Amino acid sequence: MSIRFIYGRAGSGKSHYCLEDIKRRIQEVNDRNLILLVPEQFSFQAEKNLIKSIGEKGTLKAQVLSFRRMAEKVFDEVGGGIKKYINDAGKNILLYKIIEENKNKLKVYKTSAKKQGFVNLVSDIIGEFKKYNISPEFLKENLDSIENKSLKNKLEDIGMLFLEFQNRLSKNYIDLEDTLHILCEKLDKSIIFKNSEVWIDEFSTFTPQEYSIIEKIMCSAYRVNITLCMDALGEYSERESIDLFLPIKITERNILQIAEKNNIIYQKPVNLRCSPCYRFKNSTALQHLQHSLFSYPYKNYEKSTEDINIFKALNKYTEIDYIARDIVKACRDKNLRFKDMAVVTGDLDEYENLIKAVFNQYDIPYFIDKKREIIHNQIVILIISAVEILAKNWSYESVFRYLKTGLLDLEFDDIDILENYVLANGIRGRQWLDTKPWSFKINYGNFKEDDSEEEQEYLNKINCIRDKVREPILKLSNDIKGKKKGRHICEELYNFLCELKIPEKVEELIIEFRNTDRLDKANEYSQIWDIVVDVLDQIVDVLGEQSFGMEIFNEALEIGFSQYEIGVIPPALDQVLVSNITRIKSYNISALYIAGVNDGIFPVTISPEGIFTDQDRDELKQNGLEIAPNTRSRAFEEQFLIYATLTIVDKYLTLTYSMSDEEGKAKRPSVVISMIKKIFPKLQEKSNLLDASGYEGGIEAVNSPKVTFNMLISNIRRNLGHRENINSLWIDVYRWYREHEIWNKRLDTVLGAFYYNNEIKISDLVKIRRLYGKHLNMSVSRLEKFAQCPFGYFVQYGLKVKDRKMYSLSAPDLGSFMHGILERFSIGLKQKSLTWENVDERCCEENINDLVDNVLYDNPNSILNSSKKYKHVTDKLKKTLTRSVWLIAQHMKKGRFIPRAYELVFGEIGDFPPISIELDSGEKVSLTGKVDRVDTAKEDIITYIRIVDYKSGTREFKLSDVYYGFQLQLLIYLDAILTEFDKMTKGKSIPAGLLYFKLEDPIVRTKENIPDHEIEDRITKSLKMNGLLLNDVNVIRQMDTSMEKSSDIISVSIKKDGNLSKSKSSLATRKQFEILRKYVRSTIADLCKKILTGNIEVTPYKNKTKNGCSYCEYSAICQFDTSIKGNKYRIIEDKSDEEIWKHIENKVQE
């Protein structure tokens, strides 16, 4: 029995020495077993290296083991594998159930127990205890020695969970840590290591559990060889805070203590001196780096070198772009192959997608050495979502996540139709279980009010889709509803998956992925079904005989699947390795690129993790409960990891870092950058900060066809119209693309885009008629939309593009609801033979409350019935509507105008016929619409007409908006009503005005207490109606008989000379009203003509305060951009009312 250290710095050839040593032992011809022990993640590469060194025949005597493989081999020999192995999934599922049962007993973690991730934390610390040979009993025995009460409470909580976990586990199962514990016990009976020679390589530290196994091996083997990455053996001190090899020296000390304890012979160590190191025989610069890194004082490298490069990038993209270019260049100029190169980073998640995108552009084959989580696999999503539907009462998210997996026999169009219906009507929970067909009102789509047959057909389709969705889930629900045993639930879920033919569909997907060269996906799906079955088996194993509901099962499934990762097999031999720095040790690399050499990434920021803080760990160590290292110790390990990473390459080393993140925030380079710059003072740092677009000036820009094509286009774009400025290199490149048919077509397409404009014209009038309908019927609000932007009108009313209707209370929904209640209230007064003068405030409140309640009773699916939140909204609506009707009553009492009509409709089946507008072509356009209220006041044979429009938002009358066609509605309605009234009566109808009535219950803000009547006065004044009024004091006084200088009802005031003040209101004489009527008709005719001649120009308006694009929903469609030729705003000039009146009069006189 003996031990021997094989030591030397990185690159000295320790692994190579071990392989050669094994080769020599084979040639010596003896009966000893030869074993190479390596970490689990390096076992595959170690086997490749061993076979390459000793040949296939040599493997009969020599073998590669990891601790896990060793356990399997020993158990096969002497037994010990009687208990069933439980993996991380089963372990965490069991822990979840234990935590769920005991959460109310916890002192510290009672709240945390409910949070996601707590199971993993507890699992990790239990694993840590086991690795450090701390049992629940040992933990309990040492509790009294802990003085810190907070730490003691933590230990009591964790100890209770640990004990319960171990009690349940030990009956029938073992986990990985228990496996190593049993291995240690069984090694005495094994002959595998009897008189064998063992080489332990690629380790830097061991856990106490692993030390115990090594001790048993040392006591049994002929000799144990242990490689140590360090420059000298000997004493150490923990005060040596700058010692790079401190973690390794601690390992050396622990091994020597074991040897001394067991009287094991310490043989002369093998010192592999670096002069130069085996790895760096071709690079003196890399040799100097490994010798000087973290050495104090260090010696400068006074020569220039191309073996080490530093690149300062603007951002992560230019980092990876530089690396990709250099890889291609290395293959071309340095005779390297892709398999000789690697890209590593301290944050692979951050760089992975970027590397994929850029490397694909450069046609660089790559393999990302990273296990994939399966929680995002579509099979797993389908399973979890199906169970979540039952656990979360058919929530929208779970239902449609289940449907969109693409694994069901449903068309995606049908799923979209169903989703739109569900979202629009707020369908959830028990509504999915309703045996009656859904009959919620379809308040979206292209249906007319009277199109009930088409609507019913659509409803039938939706219910048909719904039934297809429900049937399998309802069957599953009937089989497992209530509290059932875990075994039964898993069996029924398995049957459910088989009925959906998921195994067959997985096979079909594997074939499809292979046929389309998506080998990574084929590899993933070839493993997924076995994982699904394994998770169900683990649940049956640990929870099979326990009864629980869907919530527990759903959590158990998620926890189980979250523990699985799929290893990906490299699809080819010649490809660039992309890896995290922690997985790169055992590869032979000629060119290494380290991306993201920024502060916090390389080295990574060390922060306390898990249950225990650094202070907790130190106190536990003092009380004989040593567990994993604290952040200080981990910082030493991170420092050694940096050293190991920088010295793994044998020819070329490149470090890149970025100066900013995606948001443009500054990032700092790592200390590693400044360290290397100091060691290599003549090293010239490269950068692209001055030319963020790349390297377009020189031959290095010519790369793969895809990338060079983009560079060419960039050059042409920059020098458009100035060909003489283009480098001759790019002229040659241009010719190359012209000579290749595929690229020639693409070049034509891209160059054509330089002259792109988004102007659209429809010259075919037949198409226009198809778009807008054969019958020329339209609403005035649509014409106002056209006036704002013709293209916006075309998209909304021609193409009928609409936002997805959501189950929410939008401003239009709110306005419609309030209009409906006001109409019902007003008609109700008529039916009861009441007038507004008979109404008091209590009557208003009672009637409004009854009306709102009745409407909501008749519409049970209304969003206002959906929650307490909307109950509060309903109460506010009642107050607002009560305020509004009471204010209307006040207006009526103060004036002589009386309501003549409510919700007066213009249309084929309306109160009045459609408004007819004759075009120059002789065609007639019929305008439809609705007026909220028409008031009249009689004076002899004259009838004054006033129309009132209720608005839930703020709306003011602006003459300029009338002039530009943005505010035509009330004027054309007024014109039509005057015309119809003249036909109906013998007298004369005169416009008194058009007004906007604001539906609001404002809050009065004041710094002091004021009486109620003053509050009411302020509210009344804040809700004055505004609009265009007839410039006639007598008529105005009929609207407010109590008016003196100013009115509390309308925004108008009287000057000292008795005339109306124009500064306070918009006024028009009778003549001006007549001119406006003609102007509005003429404007409407012009707008209709433009619509029917196919004008769909992208010409939004713009004034000082806003523009037509401000709230436009279709900007992504029109792509309006003032930088595109022909894209200009229609500037709306700021004119006074006097100027506008002149323009209107001139227009009418033409």
Swiss-Prot record:
This is ATP-dependent helicase/deoxyribonuclease subunit B. It comes from the Bacteria. The heterodimer acts as both an ATP-dependent DNA helicase and an ATP-dependent, dual-direction single-stranded exonuclease. Recognizes the chi site generating a DNA molecule suitable for the initiation of homologous recombination. The AddB subunit has 5' -> 3' nuclease activity but not helicase activity. Transmembrane segments: none annotated. The gene is addB. [4Fe-4S] cluster binds at residues 789, 1109, 1112, 1118. ATP binds at residues 8-15. InterPro entries: ADDB_N, DNA_helicase_suAddB, P-loop_NTPase, PDDEXK-like_dom_sf, PDDEXK_AddAB-type. The lineage of its organism: Bacteria, Bacillati, Bacillota, Clostridia, Eubacteriales. Keywords: 4Fe-4S, ATP-binding, DNA damage, DNA repair, DNA-binding, Exonuclease, Helicase, Hydrolase, Iron, Iron-sulfur, Metal-binding, Nuclease, Nucleotide-binding. Belongs to the helicase family. AddB/RexB type 1 subfamily. Despite having conserved helicase domains, this subunit does not have helicase activity. GO terms for biological process: double-strand break repair via homologous recombination. Coiled coil: none annotated. GO terms for molecular function: 4 iron, 4 sulfur cluster binding; 5'-3' exonuclease activity; ATP binding; double-stranded DNA binding; helicase activity; metal ion binding. Heterodimer of AddA and AddB. Binds 1 [4Fe-4S] cluster.
